[in-house]
Amino acid sequence: TGLLPKAKNIANRRIKNANYYDKNFSKLPQITIPPRPKNFKLVYHLYIIFAENRDQLLKYCLKKGIEAKVHYPKPMYMQESVKFLKHKSGDFPTTDEHTKKIITFPCDQHLSLKEMSYVVKCVNNFYKNKI
């Protein structure tokens, strides 16, 4: 059997995982969860948040064995493919701010509740110890 018949279950599991993260990370003032469009079903291949002290959080998570990443380290308007538009650093301050804070966590359908709880626990511990 191929992947297509399983796609709905995979999507639902990823949504469930993202909802778990949303519920837990929304309790932390140092984390901002991007707005979720109404009447739109997001299927998360990445779980993206904006985090204070992102670089330190990333190092901490990696040290704890969590596959956290910065998938978008450079603002879109500064990418090589749009260089011809001649934008310069600072042209889009909101984008620049988000770029400094964006971090992703695993969200795929194979994650167990125990694994996601560990991610949440580590992020909570990081911020608890930062205060």
Label the predicted regions:
Residues 1-131:
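PLP-dependent aminotransferase class I/II
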